[in-house]
Amino acid sequence: MRRWLLPLVLLAEIALFTNLSGQSFASASDSGSYFKSYFADLICQSAPVLLLAFGMTIVLMTAGIDLSVGSLVALVACVMSSFPAGTEFWWTAVPLGLALALLLGATNGALIAWLDVPPIIATLGTMILYRGLCFVVMGDLEKSPFLSVPAYERLGQISGASLLVLLTFIILGFWLNCSRWLHEILMLGGNPIAARYAGIPVTRRIMQVYSLVGLLGFLAALTFTARNSSVSASSLTDRKSVV
C-alpha cells in the first residue's frame, strides 16, 4: 500500500489544482482529453531533466557532483543551432553535437580524475566556461533552425521524447545490471583508495562517468531544442545541477 501513496498524493494534487484553476469539463471525454494533453506536455517538458537526472545519479554514486550540466546542454544546443537547417543537419550538426558533448563531459572527468580537482570546484569552473562559450557562439542572438529540420520536431513530441527516454533508460539500465561497472562505481564512491587497491581503474571510471553525463546531455539538448524550437546563450541557466 505504501508504494501507491506517492502516486495517489500526486494524483490528488493534480485534481486539486485543476479544480482551483477553474477548469471545467462538460463530459468524461473532455476530462480525459485534458489530462492526456496535460501529461503529454509534462513528459515532453521533463524529458531533458529525466535524461540529465540519470547521469547525475551515476555521478552522485561516485561521491561527486556536476554543476555544469545546464551549461553543457546549452553549449551543445548553441553549436548545433549554428548549422543550416535541412536534411544535412542530421549528419553535420548532430554528430558534431555528440562529439562536443562527449568532449565537454570528458573535460570534467579529466579535471577531477587526472588533476585531482574537487568535483564541485571543477564543474563550477566549467559551468562558467561553457556558459561563456555560449555567448561567444551566439552573442545576443536567438536561433531557431530546428523547425526546418525534417522529422526533428518529433523528438519534442510525446511519442519521440518518451521513446527516447525509455530506450535510454532500458539500454543503460540493462548494461548497469549486467556488468561490473555499477559495482565498481559504488565502491569508488565509498572509498576511492580501497577501490584502487582492489584493482578498479578509478581514473578511467571517473572519466567514463562524466563522459556518460556528456552523452546524456547531448540527448537532453536534442529533446530541449526539438521542444522549444529555439535556443539562446541564456538557455537553461536554471539547470546548474539536476539532483
Label each PLM-derived region with a short phrase.
Residues 1-51, 87-92, 200, 208:
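Membrane-interfacial amphipathic/re-entrant helices at transmembrane-helix boundaries
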Residues 3-8, 42, 50, 71-72, ...:
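Hydrophobic alpha-helical transmembrane segments
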Residues 6-18, 56, 127, 131-132, ...:
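Hydrophobic core segments of alpha-helical transmembrane domains in multi-pass membrane transport
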Residues 13-18, 34-86, 110-116, 243:
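Single transmembrane alpha-helix segments in multi-pass membrane proteins
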Residues 19-20, 62, 83-87, 103, ...:
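Helix-loop junctions at the membrane-solvent interface of multi-pass transporters
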Residues 45-56, 71-75, 103-106, 166-167, ...:
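Hydrophobic alpha-helical segments embedded in the membrane of multi-pass proteins
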Residues 89, 93-95, 103-108, 158-231:
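Helix-loop-helix "hairpin" substructures at the membrane interface of multi-pass membrane proteins
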Residues 115, 119-179, 205-208, 224-236:
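Transmembrane helix-bundle core of multi-pass membrane transporters
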